[in-house]
Amino acid sequence: MGREQDLILAVKNGDVTCVQKLVAKVKAAKTKLLGSTKRLNINYQDADGFSALHHAALGGSLELIALLLEAQATVDIKDSNGMRPLHYAAWQGRLEPVRLLLRASAAVNAASLDGQIPLHLAAQYGHYEVSEMLLQHQSNPCLVNKLKKTPLDLACEFGRLKVAQLLLNSHLCVALLEGEAKDPCDPNYTTPLHLAAKNGHREVIRQLLKAGIEINRQTKTGTALHEAALYGKTEVVRLLLEGGVDVNIRNTYNQTALDIVNQFTTSQASREIKQLLREASGILKVRALKDFWNLHDPTALNVRAGDVITVLEQHPDGRWKGHIHESQRGTDRVGYFPPGIVEVVSKRVGIPVARLPSAPTPLRPSFSRISQPAADDPLPSVPYGQLPRVGLSPDSPAGDRNSVGSEGSVGSIRSAGSGQSSEGTNGHGTGLLIENAQPLPSASEDQGLPGLHAPSPADNLSHRPLAGYRSGEIFTQDVRPEQLLEGKDAQAIHNWLSEFQLEGYTAHFLQAGYDVPTISRMTPEDLTAIGVTKPGHRKKIASEIAQLSIAEWLPNYIPVDLLEWLCALGLPQYHKQLVSSGYDSMGLVADLTWEELQEIGVNKLGHQKKLMLGVKRLAELRRGLLHGEALGEGGRRMTRGPELMAIEGLENGEGPTTAGPRLLTFQGSELSPELQAAMAGGGSEPLPLPPARSPSQESIGARSRGSGHSQEQPVPQPSVGDPSAPQERNLPEGTERPSKLCSPLPGQGPAPYVFMCPQNLPSSPAPGPPPGVPRAFSYLAGSPAAPPDPPRPKRRSHSLSRPGPAEGEAEGEAEGPVGSALGSYATLTRRPGRSTLARTSPSLTPTRGTPRSQSFALRARRKGPPPPPPKRLSSVSGSTEPPSLDGTSGPKEGATGPRRRTLSEPTGPSESPGPSAPTGPVSDTEEEPGPEGTPPSRGSSGEGLPFAEEGNLTIKQRPKPAGPPPRETPVPPGLDFNLTESDTVKRRPKCKEREPLQTALLAFGVVGSDTPGPSNPLSTQAPCDPPSASSNPPQRSEPSVLPSQGTSASSLSSVTQSPGHPGPSAGPALANSTGSKPNVETEPPAPPAALLKVPGAGTAPKPVSVACTQLAFSGPKLAPRLGPRPVPPPRPENTGPVCPGRAQQRLEQTSSSLEAALRAAEKSIGTEERDGPTGTSTKHILDDISTMFDALADQLDAMLD
């Protein structure tokens, strides 16, 4: 082996002569066929596996390599590390030896034991020419070594700029940047950008960014920003921020780059990096001052006092989007919270912007103007929406470094970087705070949050269809430049960009297919995607976009045809592509996504964005239509009064669908519809009637509009109307209505409840309610135009089971003055709060309406288990003052004290009659004119009715015919009743089981009592009264339930007689019931606790509360009949609470009440026979009474079980 070692030593020492001699001996030995001389092994390898060719390649001697190759040395011989001579030649970076080896057919992609090919070594050590030659000889730059690094990775890791440029210019650049040969799940996975950032190679990073590498690509350690921050590479951090890296991305250890700097570094460089990251992060940290949660809002952020919240963005409705990171649990929570519950704990250093509100009042969405930055203000009005990435332009001011901790330096907004999604890996959106105190218009295609524009009621804006507003529609300045709206996109865009010296980007916008309206909705990500990569330019263009004022251009209706929709968007050229792809209807187009657009062939970014904006508008309109249908939105629209569009609450995180203001409380919760209506209407503006809906659409669910609404007072709701009905009681839309009407907020849909307040109608206009009466809950009818013929306010009950004719009726007044008053009826009422009564009662006047609250919802009748009974007060307390002799009423009864909730409690105010035209068949829930002149009234309430919420109640009432043309002689007030019916019996505690029925029958049946004695106010009746109840119609009540009539009459008089007020005092007033009828002005209805009232000359009856037991009053539906209604005499009132121990006495009173009801029916029969109607009405009345007795007996049985 001596000669082989000599050869290796000679090659190693570069002794060409010695090598030549040894090689020559090898040649001579080959020529000799026989000889004792042993042949020289040219491929001999030492202990390390090195051969002579290895040493020659490593030394770079061309002569030695050539000699060895001539001597048949193996060109791809491997050493102990698997390295070949080409590896060493490439490592040395000498071009000619590499060329020589390559000509000798060296393997260019042969890998060593650690997986490296010669190109790895050439790239790692920056040998540009060698790398270029290897690439020319088909070396594969995508091969990875055992550390999962490509030649580009090594070049970037070691800062080999020229080699990196060479590799980036190769045809496999995209594969290198994407890392196709790498597994992202590998723990050693890395990218060239990470390696360059870790080692601080700024120029290499610039080349990588220029080549289009994903700046936010993440590895186990995070993004490249994490690496640069951890290793203290300040300039690299600044460069990455300029490139638009997302500073809020967390690594697998749930750390941001700023967290890493705070935890692991303390150098001067780290302090600078902290400064840069704080400026770039867009972070405003606040601390919660108190607990806040909203279980009904899935988008709400539930916080506890002391929680530190990172503010991400500002929602247009005034709420802030925050993020809470719980380090102990390793969880993150993102949601919206009102800014009034937090205080600022850290402020970003940067450009001073608007201060945070110090008062606990959230930002309201009623700002109808977009903030316009000053000419020298470097802070752009970045729109909310997709959370832009942060970048800092080198030529843009970085803010005042001395303003750390100052109140105004809340931070600066950075422009966005690449067009990739800024969604964090933890599933929560990250981004920056929109720090202006005013909501900014959405420029993101992802935002479906209309309603930024909130006109005040005085704006008198015309009504627009649902979801007709788009964010930021009305701005403070006119369109700039003017031709933006004229479709000359190229010239308009060029002129616009020329205003801030960036006209060089005109081609970028045009090539991407953007026109001016779509530019107005661009985000910083969109700007990056079209090639605006310079952060300073991107920031400037974004700020100018935010100042654009472009009128609404998206169609605010759902077109029938796809082509029509595309033409409205200005993209009819895609009709064929959409149809051929199967999107041939509007329903299918509404579900388009970005990915599907690319598959279809819509490749221009501007066209994609415009189509997606149109798709979002379709979704908004569809949601708006569904919302309108759910609330009974009809087609009829009124033109009176101001129009408001209400935004829907963020129920599931989606933006609602209707535009307009949302009036908020100090914690950002929505005000009730009534307060919105009152605040929007200024307290005096009459609101128009909303369109009606059918009873099948009326349900409790229509009232359940999200959180916090269960105790709200509803907005007035008119009854179902059909303008085409021949005998409607509605004025045409264009005619003036005789009284002011109520309306819910436009766009919100009609509220499912009606509250019309009967009242006195003097010749002078009715004054408004005093401050004690809540305006939002009480609407007054207007005074009549002609004093002699005051119109009556329209009212109707809420029928739960409505006949067909009622479907076609319209709400409103009859044409011309209507004189006959409506008969009162029984209805569900609820007890108002004591505070409401105390506020209302002392200042009530005869012309004041009553505060109203919601009753039960309309619903189709259905059978079911009884709902839970309402809570009741044990009794009624209150007093009434007798009405004055001139017909005006005193203060209302029952308004000064608590009262029990009532079901059937009519009020007895009267109105002076006026001429009225006969009407056709009306709904059984509407009161027809009657000669007694008793207007309708509704009970009202201040608390929830559980059984009303269940929607199981059913009122069965018969249609009542209209009376004859009224006479000019009015009558004193009389009482008539329509009692509601329930298909279930509400149970009460045993000691009070019979009290509800007894008090209900007191209201109904005492009108006919003929018990003798001076204490009976009914003993003096009109001469035309029919015979006594001895000749009553067939009665099917069980004797076991109803005691004898005499006993019941006497007990009834003892219970119902008011002590100290003898009955005959009511005689003079009652004697006029059918004789001369003096003019009596209308008495206003009682306050929410509507009590029965007997007007008389010398009586002061006590209030009676009618309990919540439903009575059946059901009978055949009648055709309209002529003739005056009988005048039921007034009844005395109960003096005080009813003791629970008088159960037997209540049963007796029940009997007398039934007897009185029969007498009232007989009086009605007598009156009708005398006035000329046929006997059919008599038969129907008796049938009604009989049917009512049947249901009443069943209920009595059930109650006594």
Swiss-Prot record:
Entry-annotated residues carrying Phosphotyrosine: 253
Modification Phosphoserine occurs at: 358, 371, 393, 396, 403, 406, 409, 471, 724, 855, 874-875
Localisation: Cytoplasm
Key words, A-Z: ANK repeat, Cytoplasm, Phosphoprotein, Repeat, SH3 domain
ANK repeats: 48-77, 81-110, 114-143, 147-176, 188-217, 220-249
Start-end of Low complexity biased regions: 904-921, 935-944, 1042-1069
InterPro entries with a match to the protein in the record: ANKS1/Caskin, Ankyrin_rpt, Ankyrin_rpt-contain_sf, Caskin1-CID, Caskin1/2_SAM_1, Caskin1/2_SAM_2, Caskin2_SH3, Caskin_C
Region (Disordered): 355-466, 675-1103, 1115-1179
Protein name per Swiss-Prot or TrEMBL: Caskin-2
Organism expressing this protein natively: Mus musculus (Mouse)
